[in-house]
């Protein structure tokens, strides 16, 4: 099914993405017309330390990665946006950029660079390589950023101008977990991002998301055209800000801030499946992310549990699995309008209750993965 069926509800300026008029501050869930598939950082994130060559195939968060992902039946790409010192929104996941000069590894904060310096890292459009890129893992190891198919760094504007227009953007508002931001600083960063979005979005489906509770709250207050989702580890990691430490805290934040839904680490959903009911009862939409989303069986399980979409790295493999789900629905709905049929199935998934049989399945299957 084409993504265009989602476009009105996610990008219309006349109506909120949740289907309420702009002067109505009421929070409502997004109604996705199908199970939603999103490519993580395009065609998938890079894990330079991984023995799996698929994790080192195409440079993440690049135009090449976005456009390769667009060749598959996915609905959105997810990518990370930060703002340079001179106010330009750029697409890059890590807080720090690493390079090597005369055998010494040097780091620099992305938001402390101007645009020209940021774009000087990695391969260039003219074929040169001005500054080699390295990457630091969570455990402190540093790897040269080598992938099979490299591509230059890009800006948010580049993505709008060069990626297939029907492909939705899940724009993650990226902030440093270890930095305390004032509201004025957050607003300035978000305003720079909104300026580009408003100028170039046209009718492209767009979602904003962020792990930063106040950034999510503010972007919702600063605009009413695009849905905002709160990203949460759901307690898989613990932070000083308690709003980040459980699914129930995430639900509370969404309700208080008028957000449309949350994007949870899949492990948190599998560990506390009854939280899905609380999400639905709160009229919130639920998506998931995490490495377990590269396991087909986990995707099927979430579909049955009522999760409405997933962010994945293995775009090719998982898109085929999702296609099988949708084909099954279409067969069951023979003679019905496709869109109405899939919405009906979506509504049924929202009403799914966690049964004893499902708990038994989770207890047998999930511990092997977590």
From Swiss-Prot:
Enzyme class: hydrolase
One of the GO BP terms on file: glycerol metabolic process
Domain of life: Eukaryota
UniProt keywords, alphabetically: Glycerol metabolism, Hydrolase
EC number: 3.1.4.46
Catalysed transformations (reactions): a sn-glycero-3-phosphodiester + H2O = an alcohol + sn-glycerol 3-phosphate + H(+)
Domain GP-PDE, residue spans: 35-322
Keyword Protein biosynthesis: no
GO molecular function: glycerophosphodiester phosphodiesterase activity
Expression across tissues: Expressed in flowers and siliques.
Inducers of expression: By phosphate starvation.
Family, as annotated: Belongs to the glycerophosphoryl diester phosphodiesterase family.
Protein name: Glycerophosphodiester phosphodiesterase GDPD3
Originating species: Arabidopsis thaliana
């Amino acid at each position: 099914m084409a993504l265009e069926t989602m476009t009105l509800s996610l990008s219309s300026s006349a109506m909120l993405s949740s289907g309420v008029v702009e002067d109505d501050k009421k929070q409502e869930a997004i109604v996705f017309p199908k199970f939603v598939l999103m490519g993580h950082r395009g065609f998938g994130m890079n894990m330079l330390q991984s023995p799996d060559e698929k994790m080192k195939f195409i440079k993440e968060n690049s135009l090449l990665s976005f456009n390769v992902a667009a060749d598959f039946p996915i609905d959105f790409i997810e990518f990370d946006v930060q703002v340079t010192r001179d106010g330009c929104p750029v697409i890059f996941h890590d807080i720090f950029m690493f390079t090597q000069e005369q055998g010494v590894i040097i780091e620099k904060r992305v938001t402390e660079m101007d645009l020209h310096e940021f774009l000087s890292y990695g391969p260039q459009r003219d074929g040169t390589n001005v500054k080699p890129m390295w990457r630091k893992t969570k455990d402190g190891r540093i790897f040269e950023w080598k992938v099979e198919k490299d591509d230059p760094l890009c800006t948010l504007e580049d993505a709008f101008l060069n990626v297939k227009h029907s492909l939705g953007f899940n724009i993650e508002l990226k902030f440093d977990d270890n930095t305390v931001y004032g509201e004025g600083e957050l607003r300035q960063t978000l305003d720079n991002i909104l300026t580009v979005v408003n100028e170039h979005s046209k009718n492209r489906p767009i979602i904003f998301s962020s792990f930063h509770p106040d950034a999510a709250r503010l972007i919702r207050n600063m605009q009413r055209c695009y849905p905002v989702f709160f990203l949460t580890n759901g307690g898989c990691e613990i932070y000083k800000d308690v709003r980040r430490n459980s699914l129930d805290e995430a639900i509370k934040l969404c309700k208080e801030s008028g957000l449309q839904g949350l994007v949870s680490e899949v492990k948190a959903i599998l560990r506390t499946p009854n939280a899905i009911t609380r999400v639905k009862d709160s009229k919130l939409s639920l998506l998931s992310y995490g490495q377990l989303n590269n396991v087909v069986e986990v995707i099927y399980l979430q579909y049955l549990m009522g999760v409405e979409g997933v962010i994945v790295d293995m775009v090719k493999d998982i898109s085929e699995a999702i296609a099988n789900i949708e084909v099954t629905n279409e067969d069951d709905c023979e003679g019905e309008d496709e869109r109405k049929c899939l919405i009906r199935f979506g509504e049924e998934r929202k009403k799914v209750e966690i049964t004893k049989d499902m708990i038994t399945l989770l207890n047998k299957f999930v511990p092997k993965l977590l």
